[in-house]
Amino acid sequence: MKETILTMSGITKVFSTEEMETHALRGIDLEIYKGDFVSICGPSGCGKSTLLSILGLLDMPTDGSYKIENLEVSQLTLAAAAHIRNEKIGFIFQSFNLIDELTVYDNIALPLRYRKTPMSNADIDHVVMSCLTKVDMAHRAKHRPNQLSGGQQQRIAIARALVGNPALLLVDEPTGNLDSKNGDAVMDMLKTLNLEGTTLCMVTHDPRYADMATRKLHLLDGKILAPQTHTNANTVVDTF
């Protein structure tokens, strides 16, 4: 039996102003299992970013249940959500979100220094250098992000996301700021990580990269739909 990483049931998200209500998510039901590589596709405004924000505990749903490893997280305080996020979730962003004032090494070490359970400097060094080696960037440890190419910065962002050994890796348009060559290289790296056991959930607008996932979700108007056809025999299309 597959091990469930997260479960969503009846998740809704409503953004309200004095003039109107916007229903960004409408009754999302979703399970992600250990070892999955899930892609989330859909047009602008369909709810992809909102869903990813809730998955990553950057926002909370208006209604519904969300469990990570059987822990209900849909109504956590900001402090509790931050703790779970740092312990169980890794992020890779389109814009890299690296800190230019810090070296590559310190960018990757930063999440470890904020963990609830302290780590020794020796342990931090071992984890950081292991992650840098995994993305073939150990030789850049002392450089700063602005000394690197876009493709290299995204590799560093991947290493930072892996440093806490997260249960779930959330990936937001990882190739959006890269040319096709570097985009393909980053996607090959993500696919390799998945084959090694990392669980990924990725938002992408590129159908080629979406087809690299083992499961595809299609969002429209805040609901998960299924496409008519799919050409990748290794990918399961979810129908809701």
Which residues are covered by each model-predicted region?
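ABC-family P-loop ATPase nucleotide-binding domain
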Residues: 1-14, 228-240
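H-loop (His-switch) and adjacent beta-strand-loop-beta switch element
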Residues: 216-229
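ABC family nucleotide-binding domain
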Residues: 3-219
